[in-house]
Amino acid sequence: MALRGFCSADGSDPLWDWNVTWNTSNPDFTKCFQNTVLVWVPCFYLWACFPFYFLYLSRHDRGYIQMTPLNKTKTALGFLLWIVCWADLFYSFWERSRGIFLAPVFLVSPTLLGITMLLATFLIQLERRKGVQSSGIMLTFWLVALVCALAILRSKIMTALKEDAQVDLFRDITFYVYFSLLLIQLVLSCFSDRSPLFSETIHDPNPCPESSASFLSRITFWWITGLIVRGYRQPLEGSDLWSLNKEDTSEQVVPVLVKNWKKECAKTRKQPVKVVYSSKDPAQPKESSKVDANEEVEALIVKSPQKEWNPSLFKVLYKTFGPYFLMSFFFKAIHDLMMFSGPQILKLLIKFVNDTKAPDWQGYFYTVLLFVTACLQTLVLHQYFHICFVSGMRIKTAVIGAVYRKALVITNSARKSSTVGEIVNLMSVDAQRFMDLATYINMIWSAPLQVILALYLLWLNLGPSVLAGVAVMVLMVPVNAVMAMKTKTYQVAHMKSKDNRIKLMNEILNGIKVLKLYAWELAFKDKVLAIRQEELKVLKKSAYLSAVGTFTWVCTPFLVALCTFAVYVTIDENNILDAQTAFVSLALFNILRFPLNILPMVISSIVQASVSLKRLRIFLSHEELEPDSIERRPVKDGGGTNSITVRNATFTWARSDPPTLNGITFSIPEGALVAVVGQVGCGKSSLLSALLAEMDKVEGHVAIKGSVAYVPQQAWIQNDSLRENILFGCQLEEPYYRSVIQACALLPDLEILPSGDRTEIGEKGVNLSGGQKQRVSLARAVYSNADIYLFDDPLSAVDAHVGKHIFENVIGPKGMLKNKTRILVTHSMSYLPQVDVIIVMSGGKISEMGSYQELLARDGAFAEFLRTYASTEQEQDAEENGVTGVSGPGKEAKQMENGMLVTDSAGKQLQRQLSSSSSYSGDISRHHNSTAELQKAEAKKEETWKLMEADKAQTGQVKLSVYWDYMKAIGLFISFLSIFLFMCNHVSALASNYWLSLWTDDPIVNGTQEHTKVRLSVYGALGISQGIAVFGYSMAVSIGGILASRCLHVDLLHSILRSPMSFFERTPSGNLVNRFSKELDTVDSMIPEVIKMFMGSLFNVIGACIVILLATPIAAIIIPPLGLIYFFVQRFYVASSRQLKRLESVSRSPVYSHFNETLLGVSVIRAFEEQERFIHQSDLKVDENQKAYYPSIVANRWLAVRLECVGNCIVLFAALFAVISRHSLSAGLVGLSVSYSLQVTTYLNWLVRMSSEMETNIVAVERLKEYSETEKEAPWQIQETAPPSSWPQVGRVEFRNYCLRYREDLDFVLRHINVTINGGEKVGIVGRTGAGKSSLTLGLFRINESAEGEIIIDGINIAKIGLHDLRFKITIIPQDPVLFSGSLRMNLDPFSQYSDEEVWTSLELAHLKDFVSALPDKLDHECAEGGENLSVGQRQLVCLARALLRKTKILVLDEATAAVDLETDDLIQSTIRTQFEDCTVLTIAHRLNTIMDYTRVIVLDKGEIQEYGAPSDLLQQRGLFYSMAKDAGLV
């Protein structure tokens, strides 16, 4: 009543009047309502938002926007609006001054509105100064103000049209001006202003348009339309993608997470924690002590400190991403509340249809209200999803970045506890789990909220009967809980099997050449399949669980409805199930279905994420290296003349292990050259690692002055150009670079390589020989111009003459580094007289130290060692060359000084992993032939320098053949059975709802309905048939998915193992690992679920359309055009979405490849202090991947908003036609039709989402098939031409006019080789780098097939028999000793063909029996990944034991002893001489002394045999062999 006096002088104007506004055919608001509520609502909105918005703007300054015409116009309009409002105010004062009495509202409302317009103008300028290009707050304000003004405008027009109406001319004119200005202001607010000054997007060549998009464009995702149209017209490429928004980049996201994690760890460290480690076996060699990965992880899980002391990764993630993510809470809450508007409006609509007296406009009002709330719901929901997906993306970026950074700093012992496969899984699978969880996590509070609201409204509708439904739901909770627990168990088991499988696949791909040489593919295939079988067992259990889960989720809402309706109609006969009660309840039950369905998924997703969270926490909590354990000083600091000082230091590889190095004390003056010598496993490499801070320092003091460069024993090469490998992040200085290349003997190699130093080097340097790799590694160190150089036996990988060149020009007293401090670990004694200091290691201690002469004079262990090996090798030379041995200590010393090359002619050329099968070694030999060819056009060169094939994205639509392949993999019977059961399920659902509509239309007789029991029974029966069909299709799809998984994996594995070596050389291992991890995971887990959802959505949409057409046939006019719009939107989207998914998959491989590469070279990266550069590279690769992912999630939102608008139109027309036909329709049919139309939005959205998911996920099948159809090598076995089991009996090998090339378009690398090697002969194969030595042996094993000619072994042409028949009958001891993780026995005999006795005999002959006997597990001793818990020498002896076990007639040694010390070399050579006495032995040798007693020697040069004969004959010829022997100091 008080407002009456406020609104009018005489109190005749009420605020609300039902007869004016509702119960009339011509509705209007009262004048009081127009002057108060409609004016105040926009004002209150803006003032309520102002404090929060002001705070937000003050904290988020994006830069300053210059005044633009748009901004000036908006500001001017703001002032005009203020003037217009206050003109009304002054007019009121003027009227009062003339004695006209006015109600207070005419003073209050204009004042409030005027002040609000000033506030709006102030905000327009504040936004400009803070860099806001388009404002949602302001757009909403102008929209609300305009909608309120629209109601007033209609009223004023209606009043003006009345003849006797009183008109207030001045106020009417000001209102029309006010309305026009509001309309213009709203239109202008729809546009975006220019970018702020100094904004980063100004310099970005391809910025994301989102940052400059208008608010309207952002909420409807219109800004991505350009990309989607482009993707529809032509397949999208990487160059089409926009840069990431700055706030989504690794540079912004990762440091925050890392910083918060460190803080959390620091907090935790303050707590008293006791960590227990299991003690390691003391018998393990300590030089590179490794820990079994699985054992360590288990130990960490079981024995990690009490839970409360663990740092909480969840807390850190929340702290990092929570603030942004919290916005999604707000949107989700609004959406959840709006969800219930649909059923309530449906209730009013059914009431309207039943009430024949109600005016028509009410029906149209309900229809519009239904449409508007649905559209608002759509916009709010997709803003919510957008925030969730962006949060998920940021979390994934941050987790990958944190794992990468951690991998660069963890200790070696921690590194061994997580295999490469496990760490890659952390980056791929576990990071993805967090990403997926971000979308669902809100459902934890939202689902219960929805359930409570739905139940409350159901109570209002049905009363206490709803408790029956609640009871059903409560009964389902423990069922879901049990399933969630089981899911977690299976999840852990599945991840464990998967880790083991990826780890084994990694090893297989890294050691594929060895597998092929030994013909071990089948044994390893069986190992992988055994692990896969365990994995599939778990997947099968999960599938059964999933089927039960689907059954309960689908049936629960129906059971709830059935029980509720049954109780409702049976407890009281007067309870009538009319249309309003039934369909509003049904609509609420449909809402209830979503939270009930999603909760188990969310719980399962949380369970999976918790497993991942634990795995990540364990990895991120690993111990880190302590760089502070070594005191580093810059050179200019002075502080003594010593470069390196070590005092009483003890080092260990793992804190839990006994020390590896004990009581080390030495100091090295600046500029000194120091050699470190000693037997295998004595701690030489460990000493260098200790100086690099790679080991844990237990006690003592270590100080290093200046920067460090490191050359590891096994060269680490990046997949990059040769130049970039040498520069390694430094600036190019051409003269210095040239001198480094020359000093490292790389000039001849640059001439040979297709594009010189711009030639791309394959992964792990596959297209370089061992010597070339080592020289590149050396050049990298030299170019870095460091103060201290640590060389781990770099000269063992190169020829004698190259070794001499490098020592003289780089390492030695007159080399480039003569003024630098150099520590050289070496097995070669020829260089020792030239070094300043020799450190002799023994058993992890320094046994002797001094100059060469001092150590000889002491006559200790070093002198004894020299005497032993010098004398034996001099005796050999004496016999070979007819020289009389000289005895006596003095003379012997002299002999050692001058002739020491006898002892080690430096010669290992690390296994030329590709000299044999890459195109480049082909080029190496080919280019030697003709210098003219070196002058080939640069363009031609540039074409050839790319060796590694990047992961390619397919383009265009996924072929139907891919779907057909998948159906065949499932089995056609199961495929069609699934479709049939899906159909049965949906027909039953449709029938049950139609039956319900008939029930609600039953006539009411004496206050009750007849046939209630019959209706209820049929309704229940239809529900049961639906449940059976659901269970059936769920089982069929799950089992089919597992069958397809098994089939596709077996095909892929078999195909990869049957691929030739050339395939592995040009395919980065990251691509292959990606197929076996991510793509296979998609086939295992994603595709069956997507199929279920796709089929469900498809039948739901068809069902909804049928119901709407049955109820209102007039809808046939509108459904086809809407269907057409839907189809076009969907096609537009799928074309781009599919390509974005492919680009995302393709850009993911480099992330893993780079990560793998980093893990292999982590010690080099740390030594050169290049961590920041590698982190930056990794971040760029992750961002490149997210550049494809981000548009794909936005495209999803773009699609959903448009499709839901189509769905909302269906709701609009279904309701509209129901209102138009209300006199001819029953309430039951209206209820059925509108309740189905309310669901059609969701169904349509899901259908396109799932059809797109289907297509994007089926890409995984396409990518698996892509590698299943690669070229294959020859068959492993050919029954028709299989040689006799006793073949070869003699071992006679004939090369007849044999030619070899690596590719069709390349020249021969071996040409016209004609040579016969008789059984039992020992033949040495020698030649300079690139002469074709390894090519010859690889031709023998048919790693490369002959281009012309043939090889005959004991009368059988080897090209005619199966590869395994051939390779089983020849044995090779390769240059790089490769071992696989698994037992020692498995490494010797993977097929378990030999008895334990035979295995022990081979170990005894290989001088390993004592070592293996001392191990606690003997033959079952677990070898680490790559065999790294054995020293190189021990690994080489294991390879010898393999050869002794196979004992074939033909043995090939591929520079097998170059990497080992003299003692091991001696053991191997003597064993070969005695045990393979009656066999044909072919030896590729760089240490010529090892082949001087051979029957004959083949000298190769430029792919041709230059000399062939007995060593003594060739020396007399004084040809190539003689010059090589001379270089080696043998003559």
Curated annotation (Swiss-Prot):
One of its GO terms (biological process) is leukotriene transport. The modification Phosphotyrosine is found at residue 277. The modification Phosphoserine is found at residues 289, 905, 915, 930. Lung, testis and peripheral blood mononuclear cells. The keyword Hydrolase applies. It comes from the Eukaryota. Changing residue 671 to V: No effect on leukotriene C4 and estradiol glucuronide transport. GO terms for cellular component: apical plasma membrane; basal plasma membrane; basolateral plasma membrane; extracellular exosome; lateral plasma membrane; membrane; plasma membrane. Its main location: membrane. Keywords: ATP-binding, Cell membrane, Deafness, Glycoprotein, Hydrolase, Lipid transport, Membrane, Non-syndromic deafness, Nucleotide-binding, Phosphoprotein, Repeat, Translocase, Transmembrane, Transmembrane helix, Transport. Residues 325-608, 975-1256 form the ABC transmembrane type-1 domain. InterPro entries: AAA+_ATPase, ABC1_TM_dom, ABC1_TM_sf, ABC_transporter-like_ATP-bd, ABC_transporter-like_CS, ABC_transporter_C-like, MRP, P-loop_NTPase. Gene3D superfamilies: ABC transporter type 1, transmembrane domain, P-loop containing nucleotide triphosphate hydrolases. MK 571 inhibits sphingosine 1-phosphate and leukotriene C4 export. It is an enzyme of class 7 (translocase). Changing residue 231 to D: In DFNA77; uncertain significance. GO terms for molecular function: ABC-type glutathione S-conjugate transporter activity; ABC-type transporter activity; ABC-type vitamin B12 transporter activity; ABC-type xenobiotic transporter activity; ATP binding; ATP hydrolysis activity; ATPase-coupled inorganic anion transmembrane transporter activity; ATPase-coupled lipid transmembrane transporter activity. It is linked to Deafness, autosomal dominant, 77: A form of non-syndromic deafness characterized by adult onset of bilateral, postlingual, mild-to-severe sensorineural hearing loss. Sensorineural hearing loss results from damage to the neural receptors of the inner ear, the nerve pathways to the brain, or the area of the brain that receives sound information. (Microbial infection) Interacts with human cytomegalovirus protein UL138; this interaction mediates MRP1 degradation via the lysosome. This is Multidrug resistance-associated protein 1. It comes from Homo sapiens.
